[in-house]
Amino acid sequence: GYWNEGKQFGDGLMYTLPWSKSTEVLYYNKTFFDNNGIKVPTTWDEMEEVCAAIKAIDPASIPLGYDSEGNWFITMTEQLESPYTSALEPHYLFDNETNREFVKRFRSWYQKGYLTTQTLYGAYTSGLFVAENGTRSYMSIGSSAGATHQRPTKGADGNYPFEVGIATIPQVNPDRPKVISQGPSVCIFNKSNPQEVIASWLFVKYMTTSTDFQAEFSMTSGYVPVLKSVADHPVYKEFVSKANGGDYISALSASVCLSQQEAYYTSPAFNGSSTARSQVQNLLAKSLSAQGNDDEVIDKAFKEAITECEYQN
């Protein structure tokens, strides 16, 4: 998936090389789950059941926080094999019945108090997840590179208030898992000075093919290495072996990311693809929270998103 991302432009040529990547993972309060006999959800159906169970135990809670509405929408289209965008015209394909149905389902979850998002909460939902007072959540879906932000602050006794667990995000079909691949890729531009091009290539080559660099960068940044060989690097192997939901939560996140490497997907890039992402993010936030008839609210949100995509591009 990392390699193919650089060849997605229709002519079979390689334009970018992967540097480091992240994805989304499900952070959960393992202590709470274990104490209450709750199973980590692997599907969205199970997620609904878990949210209901958590709400029954802690009525003041918001069981699930999801940081990126855009990622959520796009990932659902990928899991459902439903159209989102195309590199060829027509570009904007996301206004369809399948997508409207999953948005309607999540709207009902929001109305039941099961979830919030970064836009609706007004900040990263990790703030709810690590909260010790007031409203809190017990699950948070966010970037794998931000694992340390999903860890509560140590108490005066040197212990964490709860242990964090990390898992693959829920799926529509666990036999065909799909999780988003994000993070920087690099490309080299042609320049009039060939020495600049050579220097660029040597720099890119080092960043993308050196196992030592990839291992060190991953451990420092929280991003996942793009070379399979890094998994056998002695320093990186030792790092991952320490994985836990406390001091080594970044290692735990990395181990989950490595275990799901066959599930990664990317969306086609074209002039206007970033607009589509912004608009489906707005669409989902509006559809969850707007007052009114469900179908009318959702219909309006989809139509406005398509109109804005076409207007801007």
Predicted features and spans:
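C-terminal capping/gating helix-and-loop segments adjacent to ligand/active sites or protein-protein/ligand interfaces
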Residues: T16-P18, I180, G245-A305
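Short glycine- and hydrophobic/aromatic-rich loop-to-beta-strand nucleating segment
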Residues: E24-Y28, T77, V186-I188
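Short helices/loops that flank or line small-molecule/ion binding pockets
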Residues: F32-F33, A52-A56, A123-S140, N282, ...
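Extracytoplasmic/periplasmic substrate-recognition and gating elements
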Residues: G12, N35-N36, K112-L115, G155-V226, ...
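Extracytoplasmic/periplasmic solute-binding protein
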Residues: Y2-E24, E48-Y92, R107
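Hinge/lid segment of periplasmic solute-binding proteins
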Residues: G1-T23, K39, P161-P170, E238, ...
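Glycine-centered hinge/linker elements that transmit conformational signals in sensory
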Residues: C51, P90-L120, I169
